[in-house]
Amino acid sequence: MAEANWGIDNDYATLRHVLLGKPEHYRWVDAGPLTKRTLQNAHKTGVKFDLQTAMAQHTEMVRIYEEAGVTCHYLRSDDVLHRNFFARDSSCMTPWGALICHMQLKCRRADYVTAIEFYQSNNIPIWKMVTAGHFEGGDLVILKPGHALVGYCGERSEQEGSEQVAAWIKEKGWDVEVVPIPALFVHLDGLLVPIEENLAVTCLDALEPWVIDWLTARGYDFIDVSFKEAKGLGVNLVPLGGKRILSMKGSDGLNAKLREHGYEVYDPDMSMFTLGGGGVHCLCQALDRDPA
């Protein structure tokens, strides 16, 4: 295993180590707007959960990481913590170590247990633990060194939790804003993911105009995602570095735009997960990226 420099100062440079989970106990439950839409419309759409299909899709995602040279680490699976494999939310990596989050969903409130276990057993420093209101890792977007956005929708991360996290990052001298988002998108990484130093994938129709202005003033251009693809978690991709993107099947418009911009795009079928509340970005936590 390659030696790691734990921590990230961006979310787009070459990914070296990633934290995942094992969806051995996965099932669809009402876990917010995304899964609720799936369950409420299933009698018309005909979609059904299948664990074997989910496991096969997850295995294909892992194969892509490994073939890209990424070392994969895993949270311990647990039959009670049956959604802890969505590794984005129970913690998040920063330049200063791991941030342990305070999750709102009842079925995920104890996910911090396996997150803390992982960091302690691998001698990865824990920087902070959220205490002021709920905060989930998908709402921290590290844009580039010195710049970050912290989101909240209220149903998952709350304003108090997001403001606590933002204050800690500001103490490090970073330029940070707290961003309210529509609950439909659950977390900010469902609306905005940086893929280069000054380029982000986003759904401009769903971001507040002042957020777009804030980003533009800091040099950002955008690859815009349609509202239809964004509500299906199209934005929720993972930059692997070196003009490589882990996206998903179904994000046809976005994937075409990425290829037009010169990116190599991997687009596995992750439908058991997107219908169940999370895309490939939700399923991972970057532990070590090259410095920007």
Task: Report the location of each language-model feature.
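The feature marks the mature, well-folded catalytic cores of soluble enzymes
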Residues: 1-292
